[in-house]
């Protein structure tokens, strides 16, 4: 045994009187922490995993543990798996993990684990769906309310026009990968486990291109400009995502296209605001219009002329409503338009206007001791 080999009890972090349950719990913690598929490319983690596995194999076995306690590493030289695969090592192994060991690692690493065969999943030979794309579209307030058709221009991966996505030159073909025998996976034994990884020779494809396409370099894809017409529905809200199926990147090995996600960003309007399906605006009226009432013309969001009735005695800030002039819902109805009244008080008066107001004041009488108004009664 190499002099540098650490004490097995120290490796697992238990004392020499530790029970089998203590050893199992300690190993479980280390196995999950340092497993190679959780720490891909981390050689230090892989070595710690092998070290913990070797220590567990010795200390969990009563006879091996007794020999180790008496003679140290020299007494158990050659008794551990040494990184190889030993089916007998799985006897009672699921008990360490409180049930299905494969379920635990499937949750940790994304599926496909089998302690005896297939390992931790990974890329398999076969069609791969293309990735989704995002497009941010800025539209006007008016277009958001009433809808529109918009032309989108963007670049995406498409199947190579020369090889039609095969990656091979015309007349050429693919051959089975000699290393993985067409499975796209290679198996590596580590302690208790047999782990499958994507084949480095074929990149997990299961086959090798003999003569790569000169246009795409063998990946079967090329970048192209794409132009599509998208219907923006009436009433679309700011931040809404619209999904356009199959307008994302092309897949590989016959895989489907991904989707295009169009995110809507609505510009502010100088005169109108929106709350759900209702629209809001503000109009000024004179103090005589507010006092006497009457009718005025206002412009709607779509430039129609609307007639608005002002009740006599209308107060500043009052909300008036015109039904059916709000946001279309797409189900045959529309929201309403709310108009906030802003009573304009003149800052300068002509002599005649001042005289008339003084006469009104004399008739009405000025209240020098007004009572407070409850805040709930304010418009």
UniProtKB/Swiss-Prot annotation:
It comes from Treponema denticola (strain ATCC 35405 / DSM 14222 / CIP 103919 / JCM 8153 / KCTC 15104). Coiled coil: none annotated. InterPro entries: DnaJ (IPR012724), DnaJ_C (IPR002939), DnaJ_domain (IPR001623), DnaJ_domain_CS (IPR018253), HSP40/DnaJ_pept-bd (IPR008971), HSP_DnaJ_Cys-rich_dom (IPR001305), HSP_DnaJ_Cys-rich_dom_sf (IPR036410), J_dom_sf (IPR036869). Transmembrane segments: none annotated. This is Chaperone protein DnaJ. Gene3D superfamilies: DnaJ domain, Heat shock protein DnaJ, cysteine-rich domain, Urease metallochaperone UreE, N-terminal domain. One of its GO terms (biological process) is protein refolding. Its main location: cytoplasm.
């Amino acid at each position: 045994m190499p002099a540098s080999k650490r004490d097995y009890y120290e490796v697992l972090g238990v004392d020499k009187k530790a029970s089998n349950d203590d050893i199992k719990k300690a190993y479980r913690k280390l196995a999950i922490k340092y497993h190679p598929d959780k720490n891909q490319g981390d050689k230090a983690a892989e070595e710690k995993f092998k070290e913990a596995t070797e220590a567990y194999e010795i200390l969990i076995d009563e006879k091996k543990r007794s020999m180790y306690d008496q003679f140290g590493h020299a007494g158990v030289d050659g008794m551990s798996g040494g990184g190889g695969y030993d089916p007998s090592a799985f006897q009672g192994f699921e008990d360490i993990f409180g049930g299905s060991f494969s379920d635990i690692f499937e949750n940790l690493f994304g599926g496909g684990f089998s302690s005896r065969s297939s390992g931790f999943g990974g890329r398999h030979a076969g069609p791969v769906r293309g990735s989704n794309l995002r497009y941010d579209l800025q539209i006007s307030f008016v277009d958001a309310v009433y809808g529109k058709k918009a032309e989108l221009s963007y670049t995406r991966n498409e199947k190579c026009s020369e090889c039609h996505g095969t990656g091979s030159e015309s007349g050429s073909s693919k051959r089975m990968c000699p290393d993985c025998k067409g499975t796209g996976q290679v198996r590596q034994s580590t302690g208790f486990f047999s782990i499958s990884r994507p084949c480095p020779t074929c990149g997990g494809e299961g086959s090798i291109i003999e003569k790569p396409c000169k246009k795409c370099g063998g990946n079967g894809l090329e970048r192209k400009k794409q132009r599509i017409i998208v219907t923006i529905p009436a009433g679309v809200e700011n931040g809404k995502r619209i999904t356009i199926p199959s307008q994302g990147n092309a897949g590989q090995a016959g895989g489907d296209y991904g989707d295009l996600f169009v995110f809507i960003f609505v510009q502010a309007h100088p005169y109108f605001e929106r709350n759900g399906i209702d629209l809001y605006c503000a109009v000024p009226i004179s103090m005589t219009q507010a006092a006497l009432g009457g009718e005025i013309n206002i412009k709607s969001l779509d430039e129609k002329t609307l007639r608005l009735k002002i009740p006599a005695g209308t107060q500043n800030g009052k909300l008036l409503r015109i039904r059916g002039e709000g946001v279309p819902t797409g189900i045959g109805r529309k929201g309403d338009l709310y108009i906030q009244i802003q009573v304009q008080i003149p800052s300068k008066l002509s002599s005649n206007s001042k005289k008339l107001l003084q006469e009104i004041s004399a008739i009405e009488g000025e209240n020098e001791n007004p009572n407070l108004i409850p805040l709930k009664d304010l418009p």
